Curated annotation (Swiss-Prot):
GO cellular component: core mediator complex; mediator complex
Protein known as: Mediator of RNA polymerase II transcription subunit 8
Broad class of where this protein is predominantly found: nucleus
BP terms from Gene Ontology: regulation of transcription by RNA polymerase II
UniProt-listed Pfam families: Med8
Annotated gene: MED8
Length: 225
């Protein structure tokens, strides 16, 4: 079963970590309920698979037994749903590990180390050192979230005051329309054409190499045009 690490979004002191607001009992209840559902489904699956492997020796449970097992499952799922709804805000700020994709079988030793409740001695020293260095500092996660939301709102307000029609500023657009820019563009085209002709002479069969933009498009989109 995955281990649960809760990140409290209230103001906390790094020197005195307050875990009183973490509903440990509720989280433990959710974990136990999930484990019960897992065991119930596992039992039902084993009964069906055992019958499939030995159809002449083992009979499937009767209808009443199936109904009772499903009723137990529904009750367990209802309880889990209720617990999840009651702790919705907390679970939004909760990190669950390891991820489902973690190779638990191949990395059994590592997973045991990761899920141990007591920190390693060197980790204890690191924690104590960090607390000593920042004992007079405070972390306000909620204030950081409010600042991030303010930045997003401000950006949206500023964006409404501008109209975007491209990647060039007004000064750059004026320069693009000037005679100097037109001459520079023509010179760049001549240089590019000269490079293209030189590549035709170098490459086998007289074929030119791919333009960097086409290479990047193929790498990002898998399209070669």
């Amino acid at each position: 079963m995955n281990s649960i690490h809760s990140a409290n979004s209230n103001t906390v002191s790094t020197s005195e970590i307050n875990t009183s607001q973490i509903p440990t009992d509720s989280l433990e209840s959710i974990r136990n309920r999930l484990n019960q559902v897992h065991l119930s489904l596992r039992k039902l699956s084993d009964q069906i698979n055992h019958h499939n492997r030995h159809p002449n020796k083992v009979k499937l449970p009767n209808y009443a037994q199936f109904q009772n097992q499903f009723q137990v499952l529904l009750t367990q799922l209802h309880t889990i749903t209720s617990d999840l709804e009651n702790n919705d805000e907390l679970l939004k700020n909760t990190n669950v590990y390891p991820l489902p994709s973690f190779p638990t079988t191949q990395q059994e030793g590592l997973i045991t180390t990761l899920l141990r409740k007591k920190p390693l001695p060197e980790v204890d020293e690191w924690i104590e050192s960090a607390i000593d260095k920042r004992k007079n500092e405070y972390v306000n996660v909620q204030k950081d979230d409010e600042f991030a939301q303010w930045c997003l709102t401000k950006i949206e307000e500023l964006r409404e005051d501008f109209q975007f029609y491209g990647f060039n500023s007004v000064e750059e657009l004026k320069y693009l329309d000037s005679e100097d820019e037109k001459k520079e563009t023509e010179e760049n085209k001549k240089i590019e054409n000269q490079k293209y002709e030189e590549e035709l002479k170098i490459t086998a069969g007289g074929k030119s190499g791919l333009h960097p933009n086409r290479v990047l498009k193929f790498m990002c989109q898998g399209v070669l045009t």
